[in-house]
Amino acid sequence: MERIASFSVDHLLLEPGVYVSRIDRDPATGAAVTTFDLRLTTPNKEPVMNTAECHTIEHLGATFLRNHAEWSGRIVYFGPMGCRTGFYLVVFGEVTSEEILPLVRELFEFVAGFEGDVPGAAPEECGNYLDQNLPMANWLARCYLDRDLADIDEKHLHYQQA
């Protein structure tokens, strides 16, 4: 089998940021779908997110994005990476990291400041509803905003080559 694109990114060089992971096209229509790598931790160097806070960010992120005034109709998916170092955001259209950055900042401001009941955290709405950690989700979102998104540069918007 061929090596998939996400395994071709050198995870020893990868740092937190907002990257275009891939752009796919529907063979029938030519419609584009862009997948973003929202990397919150440095792979293999920093601790990964625990499942509870990762799950909370997923619930808050999906709710925020699917209700966003400008972007809701273009959101395909938001969810965690299996390695728990970040999230994938999939949107309709060919979109750059620079173009999605304001939305990503809004998203993580929402998560950082969220208080109250986590949307979808009830047994009839989620298959693992008890696995939530709002305080840690708030903290991780604030860290990502302050450390990585506030003054983001080119190196953290485009994958680096070895």
Predicted segments, located by residue:
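His/Glu-rich zincin catalytic helix
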Residues: 1-53, 57-65
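A sequence-composition feature that detects small, non-aromatic residues
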Residues: 5, 28-32, 52, 62, ...
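M16/MPP (pitrilysin/insulinase) zinc-metallopeptidase core fold and M16-derived inactive scaffolds
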Residues: 43, 47-99
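Active-site-adjacent, His/Asp/Glu-enriched structural segments that form or flank metal-binding
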Residues: 78-150
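Histidine-acidic residue clusters that define the catalytic metal-binding segment
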Residues: 146-162
